Amino acid sequence: MAGPVLTLGLLAALVVCALPGSWGLNEEQRLIQHLFNEKGYDKDLRPVARKEDKVDVALSLTLSNLISLKEVEETLTTNVWIDHAWVDSRLQWDANDFGNITVLRLPPDMVWLPEIVLENNNDGSFQISYACNVLVYDSGYVTWLPPAIFRSSCPISVTYFPFDWQNCSLKFSSLKYTAKEITLSLKQEEENNRSYPIEWIIIDPEGFTENGEWEIVHRAAKLNVDPSVPMDSTNHQDVTFYLIIRRKPLFYIINILVPCVLISFMINLVFYLPGDCGEKTSVAISVLLAQSVFLLLISKRLPATSMAIPLVGKFLLFGMVLVTMVVVICVIVLNIHFRTPSTHVLSEGVKKFFLETLPKLLHMSRPAEEDPGPRALIRRSSSLGYICKAEEYFSLKSRSDLMFEKQSERHGLARRLTTARRPPASSEQVQQELFNEMKPAVDGANFIVNHMRDQNSYNEEKDNWNQVARTVDRLCLFVVTPVMVVGTAWIFLQGVYNQPPLQPFPGDPFSYSEQDKRFI
């Protein structure tokens, strides 16, 4: 009798050992079987007791790296950790029954998820790329902290580039459940037995990588509820994380602004070139081409928008307009410089204004003309006396005496070879003969004097036109330089005074930062 009983006992023990979930399982496996097999857990059902109940889902965001902001694509790339928290009453257990296990780490495809996605993503991927484990506590509290690299859309305001700041946001909501099924909120923490919502983007100083182009000014988090949208719509509520970032302009100042300003101010050197220099126009056109190249480079760096003109674009356009005017001025100056009395007449009003009034106002100096001194007058009168004596001498001497005067004196010859010409008996005849002989010389001298007088007048008139061109050059220098300085300062001071707001939201004095917690 004892044999059959012993055999039956051994068979029963083998059957019990063969049953799943009996022996050979650790406490976690036994707990998982208890939750998912024995209690019949269904991940497709919301963790609520009744249909009208809502699931409270709390969110927080930890920023580990602001990777880049591509202005052309209007895309913000960030490396974040998005923290989900909710309560699933079906995943509760008594820790004493399962070896004091208080937390389980489960794959996310085993439990219910609220399906929170980034609405304003820019790559069409709504799901989180890396599905890390879900932490389930014995009270039913569930947390899920998956890492993600988000490419979110960020509208770019290029008005004050490169002294701009941008307001980029990450908008999270559930595309599967409406406001009647889940309630979104900000995650809460406790401090001194008091709880407060995390109304900011969390940044771990040890794990955060600073961006070389942008600095974070504000990082607020806010729950947005739109009462005008029905609750059965997925757009009724969302949790938005705002990143207000300011550009670090040093790179653009060194590589774009300083070269642009230096090239633009080179246009003032055109007015220091001589009026007859044809390179005046060449220099101005070279500056214009350089500005066009910089404008082309900037247009490739910014989005193609017609909403606003960037600050550096305004400066380049201002400089190009000014340089175009300088080119026109150079052509006018060259035209004035090469004018002559035979083609243009310089009126007295223009002469007085450009040769007397403006040069005094512009502090221009003109070489003074040398006045004939008394010595020159004495020299001229003595020369006239010598000429008269020479004419009288030559009229009384015969030609042979004039030719052999020195030889006759040397050989002691006192007798003339030819009889000297006797002066006429009548003075009227003498004057008539002298007049007839000297008339051609006088006419030639008068012609030379008149020609020299006309030539001097011509040259003087031409010099006056040159002086007018020089005065116009100096006047344009005195006009263009202040306009360039004032215009440059006015344009760039707009960017210097373009600062982000002191608070994240206009009209809201709250700073939404760790230093300004709002306890509940």
From Swiss-Prot:
The chain crosses the membrane at residues 249-273, 281-299, 315-336, 475-493. Keywords: Cell membrane, Disulfide bond, Glycoprotein, Ion channel, Ion transport, Ligand-gated ion channel, Membrane, Phosphoprotein, Postsynaptic cell membrane, Receptor, Signal, Synapse, Transmembrane, Transmembrane helix, Transport. Residues 25-248 are extracellular. It comes from the Eukaryota. This is Acetylcholine receptor subunit delta. Residues 337-474 are cytoplasmic. Glycans are attached at N100, N167, N193. It is a multi-pass membrane protein. The gene is Chrnd.
